[in-house]
Amino acid sequence: MDNYVGKRLDGRYEIQEIVGVGGMSVVYKAYDNVDDRIVAVKILKDEFLTNDDFVRRFKNESKAIALLSHPNIVKVYDVSFGEKLQYIVMEYVDGITLKEYNQKQGAITWNDALFFKPKY
């Protein structure tokens, strides 16, 4: 796995730490020195850069997220689809994943599930 911690992307995004690893990408916490904010940068793994199917999926993911607008969905701020590096810059949300929550608290109860449901 490529590690971008300590590197700067496009002279703007200072990669600070890994926050998640998936099958085709790695998500990093980064500092955006242009907009002065913390962001999440999702980078397509190098091994998939030459696979047209994975590149297409990655691009489609960024388009789908960018089209959605809801308080519970992160915003897409920027994308880069270069030949050697492809990434999506998104709103960073600090906290734990549902998987981590379940590991710490056990199975989620009905009361907890109702707490997390949208309140319309």
Regions found by a protein language model. Give the residues of each.
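Conserved N-lobe loop of protein kinases adjacent to the ATP-binding glycine-rich P-loop
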Residues: Y31-I38
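Conserved short submotifs of the Hanks-type protein kinase catalytic core
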Residues: E83-T97, Y101
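A short, low-complexity linker immediately N-terminal to eukaryotic Hanks-type protein kinase catalytic domains
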Residues: M1-I15
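Protein kinase glycine-rich loop
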Residues: I15-G22, V27
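AlphaC helix of the eukaryotic protein kinase fold
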Residues: K45-L67
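Flexible N-lobe loop architecture of eukaryotic-like protein kinase catalytic domains
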Residues: G20, N60, S69-N72, L85, ...
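Activation-segment/catalytic-loop signature of the eukaryotic protein kinase fold
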Residues: V79
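Activation segment signature within eukaryotic-like protein kinase domains
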Residues: F116-K117
